Amino acid sequence: MAKFKQECIFGIRAVMEAIQDEKEIDKVMFRQGIKGDLFQQLFSLVRERQIQFQYVPEEVFKPFAGKNHQGVLAEISPIPYQDINTVVDAVVAEGEMPLILILDRITDVRNLGGIARTAECAGVSAILIPNKNSAKISSDAIKTSAGALYHLPVCREKNLKKTIKELKRRGLTLFAATEKADKFYTEVDMKE
């Protein structure tokens, strides 16, 4: 039986309303074989908004037995995502140089939470993650972050490459980090 680590909403109209109300939806799951005009409207909306979706077997819906889920579930993010440009503008307006942590292909929620905890202590202005191929912000990620994910702005972008180019154009310096580095991050002046 599927276990959900995030808040879920179910039902075609409820999910459509959440999307139209611009709620933070991480993924929409459709029961395999689902059909109908209303489903087609929802599916078009999901594609138009570029929301991640997946077709899943009936077993995924067992925790919602007895509820009229209509073969549709949506995972809702526990935090609001911020716009990266708005965050950068706010930090610059305070007279500081933004320190944005870009996380690419971090797929384990506990790793994401641990990194966020360290990032908050290191003075990071915001965390930037991709829409796809990334761990979702879940209760496990928040717990591991010791609440840092509630304090740090988290930005989610569809195209990291394009966003990185825009950040460079705005004057931000980029640093890469790896576990094979010769220096620890505290030995580098990242706000120079």
List where the protein language model places each region.
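Post-transcriptional modification and biogenesis factors for structured RNAs
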Residues: M1-E192
